[in-house]
A protein has these predicted regions:
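Non-catalytic terminal extensions that flank enzyme cores
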Residues: 1-48, 67, 109
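N-terminal catalytic cores of NTP/NDP-binding nucleotidyl/phosphoryl-transfer enzymes
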Residues: 30-92
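A glycine-rich helix N-cap at a beta->alpha junction
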Residues: 93-114
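Internal, well-ordered alpha/beta segment that forms a basic, Gly-enriched binding/recognition surface
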Residues: 115-120
Length: 120
């Protein structure tokens, strides 16, 4: 890569980051003004216990959005485990464990909808 190509790539990355930050700030303000305009669909595959990476990567933000009044739907993607693994293992226990982890992290079933993909 030449210096000019490297500079252009850096410039493009910086511009993209700046646009992303600006858009995030706009959405954040809009949520503060009227959280009922927003809905989030998120979830995990029940392949084992959640860990700190899940918490800092997504769970913390899910709880924050829920607490701000965003309509929050949390999917337990059990069908994905069934279709993309050689064996499903103890899927029932893993689904229950995942829901327990959600509750422990602060997902409130009174304010969020938690559901299994296989139940839809």
């Amino acid at each position: 890569m030449t210096r000019s190509e490297d500079a252009l790539e850096t410039s493009t990355s910086d511009a993209s980051l700046a646009r992303s930050k600006a858009r995030s700030a706009e959405i954040d303000l809009a949520i503060d003004q009227d959280p009922s305009r927003f809905r989030i669909l998120t979830g995990d595959r029940p392949t084992g216990h959640l860990h700190l990476g899940h918490y800092f990567g997504t769970l913390r933000n899910r709880v924050l959005l829920q607490d701000r009044g965003v309509d929050t739907w949390v999917l337990v993607a059990d069908y994905q485990v069934i279709t993309d693994r050689d064996g499903v293992g103890p899927i029932r226990e893993r689904v229950l464990g995942l829901v327990a982890d959600y509750l422990a992290a602060g997902i409130d079933p009174e304010r969020s909808t938690i559901f299994n993909h296989s139940a839809v």
